[in-house]
Amino acid sequence: MKKLFVIILLLVLGACSNGKEAGGTEKSTRETVVNKEKELKFVVAPQYEGKTSDLIELGKKLTKEHPELGSKGNMAIYFTGAVSDGRAALMLVNKTDVDIKKDLEFSLSWSYDGKTIFDNQKISYTIKDSGELPSYTTTLILLPLNSEQLDLVDSMSDPSKMTLSMSDVKSVE
């Protein structure tokens, strides 16, 4: 339950940071914008198509319930609040007009309450293992955590103390 609360709070805070001010006018403007954008879809690698798991269901649910994830023209990454077999489940969002059909590399920085989980960690997203990431889709990536990182991630309770960013995104030939 705690993790579900963290997930919802993260998504709400992320959504709030995109708005100019709180109130009824923002809500109707946001609904209009979301309706005009392409629909965000959750995808899995071909080897997982037709299969189900708690993580796949979580990815589908978050994508359906939070179409505001990411920003138009950009890629983004979010922590789902889930950890499975010592691996953190992060959601990669592609809201660009480009279908990702080649392997990607990017740097990930992630901290909580001033304590580093990853510092410019090079992450590889391989098409062979993870599948293509078409325009306006989301997918999950699982990052292995050592025991110290796992303890820190498990202790997270205040989303406002977390920072997570990706940089240096590039296609790999």
Q: Where are the language model's segments positioned?
A:
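Positively charged n-region of N-terminal signal peptides that target proteins for export
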Residues: 1-4
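C-terminal motif of bacterial Sec signal peptides marking the signal peptidase cleavage site
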Residues: 12-15
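Short structured motifs
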Residues: 73-80, 91, 124-129
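Intrinsic-disorder/low-complexity, polar/charged segments enriched in Ser/Thr/Lys/Arg/Asp/Glu/Gln
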Residues: 85-89, 138-140
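Conserved aromatic beta-strand anchor motif in extracellular beta-sandwich/beta-rich domains
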Residues: 108-112
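Short, solvent-exposed, Trp/other aromatic-anchored flexible loops in extracytoplasmic proteins
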Residues: 116-159
